[in-house]
Every structure is written in C-alpha cells, then in structure tokens.
Amino acid sequence: MPPEPRFVPRFAAEPPQEPLPYGRWADTLRAELLAAVLALGDDVGEPGDVVWFPDRTWAGRTYVPGTARTDRGLELFGCVSYEVAGEPGAFAATVDVTEEVAEAHPEWRIDLCDEVVGAWRGELGKVAQMTLVWGVPLVEGAAVATAELARLVVDQCTVMENRFTLLAPDDYRGDTLDVRVWDERGHELAVESLYEED
C-alpha cells in the first residue's frame, strides 16, 4: 500500500458501547447536564425531556450528547462526559442554547450539533479540532452516518433510534467536516456541513 496522502486520525473514538441512556442512568446524566444549564441564566426557560444520543469514547473519556427543548422554544444542546476507568466518575458537562431548530429550517436534511472536545497535533504544526458531532437525520431510511474530511471518511456510526454521534478531526489544513447519512444498501441520502454556507 502506498503512503497516505492525508495523514489524519481516522476512527479515533470507540464505537458506541451502551444502549441509549434510560432509567436511573439517564437521570444521573440529566442532572449533570441541567447543572450546566444554570450557567446560561433564566432567559433560556425551563428544560423539557432530554433526548440522548449514542456514546463515544476518546482519550479516556466517554461523551454522551443530549438535546432538550425549553418552554420558550429554544433548544439546549450539550454533552456529559466522564472517565471510563471502573465506575463512571469525574463528570463534566457543557451546554449551549440556540434559536435555530429543525422545524424552522425545512431545507435541512440533517439536524446537527457539535462540540470541540480536544485537539490533535499533525504535521508542520497544524492542529485538528477533535469534534463531537451528534444529529438526527431528517430523511427516511438512514442507517449509518459518516464524517468526512476532504472526502476522506474519518468516522462513522450506526444510526440508533434515528440518532447518531460522531467524533472526528475538523478544521485541519483548511478542510472542514461534512456529515453524510446512508441507507442500509450504502446509498447516500443526505449531506450537511458543520458550517453555514455563505
């Protein structure tokens, strides 16, 4: 095999190891996420139920993303992470809020959220942003989601209950991530960039 023309981390994160959170575990994660919501102030409103996404593990931490609507029509999005050695511990949570929701954007094919969780140092001092990306396909029949950097697949995730989570290098050497969803036969159904087009 010839050398790789693009030297970037591929499939760096473990695939999902657990079912989507439920019961007491979901309650624990919700408490951590809502504690982070307090820092956003009262203007966001009262959060509703949290929709959890598949877990991904990288660099010794497991990340579980989630979203929740508030009674003011905003969407909270963030993730809870924890150390993976033994029982979950050293919890941390990040959360943000947006007015941009899928119902207001019929042109969207995939509803995406993202959070930078680390960095990967490449050649010649270039740095990739290791980015957690979670989303909901807005097209029927999605079975697998992939993350691509300059048309190179760098991560993939089986769609679980119409949700997926990716963890991949982004913003590296001028290239940014595209997310694609595919049906069970490998036909592309939709593609979205993490960045708004000008």
Task: Please name every model-derived segment.
Residues 126-132, 136-138, 143-198:
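Ser/Thr-rich low-complexity repeats and stalk/linker segments
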Residues 53, 115-118, 187:
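A generic signature of intrinsically disordered, low-complexity regions enriched in glycine/proline
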